[in-house]
Amino acid sequence: MSNEGNGGGPDYDVVRRVVRSRKTAKVLADPDRPVDFDEATRARLDPLVREAILEAGWAPFHYNRAHGGLAEPWRVHLLFQKDCRKVAECLEGWSGDLAPVGKLPSMFAACGAAALITWVPQFRTGGPGAESGKQQAVDDEHLAASASLVQNALLLLTAAGFGTYWSSGGAALREPGIAARLGIDAQESLLALLFVDYPGSPADLSRKPGKNRDLRSDGWLREVSLS
């Protein structure tokens, strides 16, 4: 149902369609036989991914993080296919006995790009002493702002015709040595690993839908009426 003429409009309808059409799809390939997009495809699609991530940076943030000369509390480490294939090939060796890698090599082998999205805690650094309530609130704001960037990125990539999967990144990518290989500073905390499935990827790849999509309801909305 359109909201044009009663407070909505075409922009509302477009955004609503994108929000509803965004869906989780875990795409897997054999790490020994990774997906190989040709140069023309990469030249056409890589800039669209980069642009979507940059536009996602219009997410709101409440406090100036003032870290590394940047106000934003988030960082994005973007890998395109060549480097995704390198991770797929090497991750198990990098990890060794440190942490299980799970399906990550198969996911890196299938994607056209991957974005490691981190946030930069200001007080929640794991050092001695408890944070004050104010400090906890500031870091909660930094984390919430960074999560809004993740959703922006998912919606923009969906609107551009890409498939997406939001992974936590697992334990392996949080190992300091592996994180450093991927450009993640020691002060950053991994929030999301977004895998980007390029249009035209092989149809015979394993694709697993999100398990929670059919569990959605509107029971979380509570309208408050004060007497």
Regions found by a protein language model. Name each.
Residues 1-111, 227:
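N-terminal amphipathic, basic helical "cap/leader" segment at the start of enzyme domains
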Residues 81-86, 121-123, 200:
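Short, charged/polar surface micro-motifs in flexible loops or helix N-caps
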Residues 98-100, 161-165, 188:
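Short secondary-structure capping/junction motifs at helix and strand boundaries
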Residues 105-107, 180-207:
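A glycine-rich helix N-cap at a beta->alpha junction
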Residues 109-122:
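Active-site-adjacent structural patch at catalytic or cofactor/ligand-binding sites
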Residues 114-116, 193-195, 223:
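Conserved hydrophobic/aromatic beta-strand scaffold that supports enzyme active sites
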